[in-house]
Amino acid sequence: MKRAFIMVLDSFGIGATEDAERFGDVGADTLGHIAEACAKGEADNGRKGPLNLPNLTRLGLAKAHEGSTGFIPAGMDGNAEVIGAYAWAHEMSSGKDTPSGHWEIAGVPVLFEWGYFSDHENSFPQELLDKLVERANLPGYLGNCHSSGTVILDQLGEEHMKTGKPIFYTSADSVFQIACHEETFGLDKLYKLCEIAREELTNGGYNIGRVIARPFIGDKAGNFQRTGNRHDLAVEPPAPTVLQKLVDEKHGQVVSVGKIADIYANCGITKKVKATGLDALFDATIKEMKEAGDNTIVFTNFVDFDSSWGHRRDVAGYAAGLELFDRRLPELMSLLRDDDILILTADHGCDPTWTGTDHTREHIPVLVYGPKVKPGSLGHRETFADIGQTLAKYFGTSDMEYGKAMF
């Protein structure tokens, strides 16, 4: 029986890549800088002391970081027994965004350039804005700028509630984001607006990767909160992923937990499970692992590392999240059968000590564990697509165009 379980710790980079200078990210190191802050006692907010990740360390995390950067993260045990196979992987894709990272993991790197809204003020073309106002019958719009999602709610949330004007904003990523209040504007209305925006961006040739619905609740600035009803409308991958091949060639099953289905525009996904927060995502993953049959992938994205702590530059929060993940990791490992493989990885970096609020161009960890997986180093991987090619070989699908099987 062949089953694979892929866990993406969204944004969990392990050191800047060789081409980081092109992105302004030389020296970025999500894991290393979190560990350094913890070791210095600078991340003692609800948790305390050095970063404590014994289970991830046993799977090779500290060694993968050493391969990427040349050193073991502060406070982590470089001499611990390693029971898994580990690697550090470079991104072939042209960006450092979520779709590029995930698609490349599944064997389809993004070799074209995404479109971006690079102006920090008046970010969107007037023609696009006019079409959205007309088609969605809007009273106008707010924002039209680059912003952090939480900052813009404090700035414009109250005005949005009074006027009914949606908040449009973007970032350094290829995204068009729309924030609206779940109660005063309505969730269904927000989703419909996002569908219209997706159509206009596609038809207009803007080449924008994602439209993201950002619903929130609350009654005034300072207590607005984004909810778990986020929805991403992505373009489809430019070629069949290993997920699609498993479904088409092996009549397999691919279970999305969290936002995976959105990232792949539902391509190659046979079941979608919604969950919000690390514990709920873990619980849903465990349930699906227990029910998984032959030729099945259970694919989970743990988005909180990125959205709650990476972008918000919350070192202590990120550290606490990693420690929670590590504590629960044995629950996943205990469910593995003889031929199963568990892959822990990431899609990009988002160093919470870095300037700004955007992603960072970093190597990702590739930690592989299973009863039949030989422990030890798998070395430096030239592309995330090595994961996809490994899965193609494991399940016996046709080869992917990119990547080399790791074993």
Swiss-Prot record:
How the cofactor is bound: the record states: Binds 2 manganese ions.
Record localization: Cytoplasm
Q: Name one GO biological process term.
A: metabolic compound salvage
Q: What is its EC number?
A: 5.4.2.7
Name the NCBIfam families for this protein: deoB, PRK05362.1
Q: What does the similarity note say?
A: Belongs to the phosphopentomutase family.
What protein name applies here? Phosphopentomutase
Specify the taxonomic lineage.
Bacteria, Pseudomonadati, Pseudomonadota, Gammaproteobacteria, Enterobacterales
Q: What is this protein's gene name?
A: deoB
